[in-house]
Amino acid sequence: MTMRIAIDAMGGDNAPDEIIAGTMESIQALAPDDRLILVGPADRINAQLENHEFDVDRVTVADAPEVIGMDEIPIESLRKKVKSSIAVLAKLAKRGQADAVISAGNTGACVAAFQMRMRNLPDVNRPGIAVVFPTFEGPVVVCDVGANIACKPINLYQYGIMASVYSKHILQVENPRIGLMSIGQEDAKGNEVVKKARELIRADSNINFIGNIEGRDILRGVCDVAVCDGFVGNVILKLTEGLVDGLFKAIKHELLAEKLRLAMKFKPVMTRIYKKYDYNEYGGAPLLGVNGTAVICHGASTAKTITNAILASKNFHTKKINHKIV
């Protein structure tokens, strides 16, 4: 089945070089009839493409002369920059010209544009960004990590359902355990939104709900899905990134301070562990709940991130995750 994947060439800190490089690298792993669409200023993209060898029938360019910066206000920027790469990306999906869209650009603008153009799945109130956290007990899906910072109980309940489907069919977890992020495991803990969400989740017999969880439980692998609002989820995500990076730097420093020979001995082990926790290996995070396949990547995405995001979007689309959610 032919798939058309549109990529925001101007999204992220390393655009367009790394985005285009990652797009080109993904070609070998895709089916011969899959097509890639690079969205952004045509002159800049075409100039970059001259550095790559590829089948011109497989990679096309959709001109989008404007770019939304990472620090711009999402709704306002989309209104002013109708020819921005994010806006054009969303339009391609709406018109049925792209089966999946990918961007490492302004997260708020991506969420707003994709939701506005692609619309939500039936009965889904608000979409949520689902990120996979690797643990030694298996992958944990955290949803939401930034799409919706002011959740209602129904939003958290629906995040649990959607992330559970994602965990089961993408990560192959047979009966995902769902935990609700709170400030304590006891039922009395948490604000009113969390308490009401817990009642909704617990009342659904189709959900394998284990109750409240705390921040430390995620990396312990206590659950397979952690549900929270976008504010809490984003703090957890950024804190974990910094923690992992700082921890590895500290270990590297201590090993080198001892003996270079000792450091070299542990290098393969450290490399394997670091790879396990490297977000570049996982590509992007799906925006669950929109009526289509949308993947949002880290702002610091490299070519490897984009390549993996493209492959992840194909997997999401091919396995018909949205059909399973509905």
In which residue ranges do the predicted regions lie?
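N-terminal phosphate-binding or glycine-rich loops at protein starts, especially the Walker A/P-loop
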Residues: 1-44
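Short, glycine-rich nucleotide/cofactor-binding loops
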Residues: 7-17, 147-157, 296-302
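Short glycine/serine/threonine-rich phosphate/pyrophosphate-binding segments
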Residues: 15-19, 82-96, 100-114, 125-129, ...
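Glycine-rich phosphate/diphosphate-binding loop of Rossmann-like nucleotide-binding domains
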Residues: 17-18, 30, 35-37, 149-211, ...
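Phosphate/nucleotide-donor binding subsite
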Residues: 54-98
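Glycine-rich phosphate/nucleotide-binding loop
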Residues: 115-128, 132-142, 222-226, 230-325
